[in-house]
Amino acid sequence: MAYRKLGRTSSQRKAMLRDLTTDLIINESIVTTEARAKEIRKTVEKMITLGKRGDLHARRQAAAFVRNEIASENYDEATEKYTSTTALQKLFSELAPRYAERNGGYTRILKTEPRRGDAAPMAIIELV
């Protein structure tokens, strides 16, 4: 299987991909280097496909990869409590139904100007 090393050890690379995948699920658009964006695309596509399957096994597989971060927090005035949704809940309740009719190709990579300082090629990766 071909992949990019991204100048990191395997555990550092896996942690970075988990973090960036979770951030993309939460924010639906992030700015990163072009090489990282191309690697994130693979993992995000797999996570959304797991979300579309929606069974217990798919939910557990996605939970093993996606970080347990809060995606949004709302205040309910009637009960005077905060309700929050995690990245995993957003994946299964919002993103999976949105892409139910689409067979792959859930992300878009837009190249931007090089980063100031080291001229690394930058890109915006976003959900379609």
UniProtKB/Swiss-Prot annotation:
Pfam families: Ribosomal_L17. GO terms for molecular function: structural constituent of ribosome. It comes from the Bacteria. Gene3D superfamilies: Ribosomal protein L17. Keywords: Ribonucleoprotein, Ribosomal protein. InterPro entries: Ribosomal_bL17 (IPR000456), Ribosomal_bL17_CS (IPR047859), Ribosomal_bL17_sf (IPR036373). GO terms for biological process: translation. Part of the 50S ribosomal subunit. Contacts protein L32. This is Large ribosomal subunit protein bL17. It comes from Streptococcus gordonii (strain Challis / ATCC 35105 / BCRC 15272 / CH1 / DL1 / V288). The gene is rplQ.
